[in-house]
Amino acid sequence: MTNKPTPTFYIFHGEDSLTRGEAVKKLREAMGGDSNADLNISEFDGQVASPAEIINAVTSYPFLSDKRLVIVKDLLAWLTRKGAGAVGKKGIEHLLEVLPTLPDYSRLVLIERETLSDKDKLVQLAESSPNGYSKGFTAPKDATGWIQKRAQAEYNIQIDNRAAAALAEVTGDDLQRADNELVKLFNYVAGERPITEADVAALTPYVPEANIFAMIDALATGRGQQALQLLHRLM
């Protein structure tokens, strides 16, 4: 049994910009760390560059390297938008024809901010072609659970249920913002103890009711400075 070859084109789609961005970062890192790597990485705005221009870039032979990486944002959404007409249809047809034939050194990454349908022709092509790869990055249904898992896996720190729920209430499905807040909270507690709801209230713009609760808790446990910070947030 032969292994599937390394993909030459990828479709990363979905609302989870954080995890999607991490997947793109891994492909960047795979280009190597020498000075030639940046010479073989190009980025395009799919609303500006044409499919022909993008294909020309990704099929250009790499300079002193064995790979060329081209990253394109929102191309498919642009080609299939309302009003794209014959130009959009022609662009999709061009991609369907050319993507399976990309040379082995090509690494084309199509990034879409919205989740694509399983019936999308290019998604189906990426999933069925030996040289294609498609992955959806949907926002988790349980943001509180995601925050707790992220804190443990990425920062080796615990965040209690109420703190995670409070943070999830503030950040919603914006996982990038949630992760940024986790970094702040990790530094705030110096990685020495679990993150509490009072910590979230002290550092994060938060619902007033929770700030009041956290302030009372801080006063009751002798944390006067933290209680004062929370009082200023309420004023």
Describe these PLM feature segments.
Residues 1-235:
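Conserved beta/loop motifs at nucleotide-recognition and modification sites
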